[in-house]
Amino acid sequence: MEAEVDKLELMFQKAESDLDYIQYRLEYEIKTNHPDSASEKNPVTLLKELSAIKSRYQTLYARFKPVAVEQKETKSRICATVNKTMNVIQKLQKQTDLELSPLTKEEKTAAEQFKSHMPDL
């Protein structure tokens, strides 16, 4: 889950960087090649639209950031709870001299999938 969050964060950063570059290139192209082109869409309008798109990306990123933080905190709490539960089970097994039967194939698969999503365990 953390890898996905980091990947999304990098995607937003790259998108913002790409938009900055596009805006710079458009401004440069307009200044050098199309000083007074009347037949095409107004370059100033295009730049305003680009600025609006960039603003929407920044707003989306600002909304995304707290979600990413909450996901990391939730993951940490889940891992801590699972670790505590595992410790309690192990203590109970020792106190009662109880041995559990080996895991079934499905249980092993589920445990592996869980560990792959929660490497902190």
Swiss-Prot record:
The modification Phosphoserine is found at S101. Keywords: Cell cycle, Cell division, Centromere, Chromosome, Cytoplasm, Cytoskeleton, Kinetochore, Microtubule, Mitosis, Phosphoprotein. It is found in: Cytoplasm, Cytoskeleton, Spindle; Chromosome, Centromere, Kinetochore; Cytoplasm, Cytoskeleton, Microtubule organizing center, Centrosome. The keyword Cell division applies. Its main location: cytoplasm. Component of the SKA complex, composed of SKA1, SKA2 and SKA3. The SKA complex is a homodimer organized around a central W-shaped coiled-coil structure, formed by the interacting domains of SKA1, SKA2, and SKA3, each end of the 'W' is extended further by the C-terminal microtubule-binding domains of SKA1 and SKA3; the complex forms extended structures on microtubules. May interact with NR3C1; the relevance of such interaction remains unclear in vivo. Interacts with the MIS12 complex subunit DSN1. Belongs to the SKA2 family. This is SKA complex subunit 2. It comes from Macaca fascicularis. The lineage of its organism: Eukaryota, Metazoa, Chordata, Craniata, Vertebrata.
